[in-house]
Structures are given as structure tokens and as C-alpha cells.
From Swiss-Prot:
CDD domains: TIM (cd00311). Homodimer. The gene is tpiA. Pathway: Carbohydrate biosynthesis; gluconeogenesis; Carbohydrate degradation; glycolysis; D-glyceraldehyde 3-phosphate from glycerone phosphate: step 1/1. GO terms for molecular function: triose-phosphate isomerase activity. This is Triosephosphate isomerase. Transmembrane segments: none annotated.
Amino acid sequence: MRKPLMAGNWKMNKTVSEAVSFVKALKGAVTGVSNVEILVCPAFTVLYEVNNEIKGSNINLGAQNLFGEAKGAFTGEISTAMIRDTGCSYVIVGHSERRQYFGETDEAVNKKTKAALAADITPIVCVGETLKERENNVTFSVIEKQVRNGLADLTLQQASLTVIAYEPVWAIGTGKTATPDQAQEVHSFIRKIYAQMYEESAEKVRILYGGSVNPGNVSDLMKKSDIDGGLVGGASLEAESFTKLVKYSK
């Protein structure tokens, strides 16, 4: 049985004081929740303070990115050791905004994924198609390429520990959402490709949906057999709305 994961991706939002206020409110609201794994992924600048605030709670900490090298002359980058030192157990890899604005390739995603796993940090590896790709009916070929290249050459154990997030790029921050059936179709396809690559690990891997998840659609999405949680953007920035996602009912 795959435990649902609700992951809040704060993107470039929240100062230290705003972040601390948020997690204080969230911590109180989700006390006692054990059937859903809760994750917040703040900006690098507030990881330390957020970690101090959530210690001993049921909230996990993740980073939004990492670099594939252990250390060195890579100005502006951050390593797995630095992330772990702030208390992170997860890291987002290959988010569509990283691919779009910073030119991240599947090969870079693969390197980061392996670096995270080597450091015992769980990568949340993002895949997804643009609106143009969906309209051109190449969604599945795009997704297959991203999965096969971005998640190549893992051990079976690493493959089962990895989390995948399907984020249709056309549904991120637009208010548009893939219907539950559309999302399930792609999630099922991802699991099928993963099974070809890593056999039984495909049944263990959690596949999150990330595309304008909100309190109004989360229950219908989570009813689908291959949707194991959400990678949440805007709705994770307010404690009240994120709590509703965490406490969704099928």
C-alpha cells in the first residue's frame, strides 16, 4: 500500500518570518494526521528556520532543487550535503519551471536524481507536457522520454524509493486542471513505463499529480488508483488551504 504524500512547493515565496508563521499554523492544524505524509518545500533561505519549527512534528522538509556535484566552484548552487544539513529528507528535481527557465535537461535531472539518492534524500522527479505537446498528441512520447532518460540507471531499491510527479505544464498556475481521468491516464502510463524499467518497483513508487491541485479537486483526483498525492503550488502557500489538501477524504 502506497502512503499518500502531499507536498507543498512554495517556489519563490515567503520570508523567514512568513515561513515560520506558516509552519506554526500548519503544525497545529495537522497534529495527529498519520494517514498522509506531509511535506513542505520552502526556499533555501528559510530551510533552517522551518526545520527548527517542525522538529518533532509530522511535517517533513524538502528542498526545491540541488546540484549534481558534491562541492566546488559552482557559484549559486547547493549540494546534497548542504540540503541534508538543514534537515531535508526530500528534494524536487526537474520541475517544469527549472526546465523552462533554466534549461534543465533530462540528463541533468538524472544526475541530480542519482546525487539525491546517494545522499539518502528522496527525489521528487517531475515530468510533464506543454499545452502545445498535448494539442499535438505527443503527450505519451514526451512523458516516456522524460521518464526513461531522467530516471535511467537506478537500482531496483533506488527506483522504489524515488517519487515521480506528473505536472502537465499547461495546468501549472493557470487555474486549468487535468481532469481526474486525464491525470489517471498519464499516471497509469508512467507506472507502465516504470514497470518496463524497474519491474516490481513500479508498484511501490508514488506518483504525485501537480497541476493546480486545490481543495475543490483533490478528493476526485485522489480517488484514482495511480494518483498517490499532490505536488501543490499556490494552494500550499496558505495553511488553511494546504491543511484541507492534507485532510482530503476519498
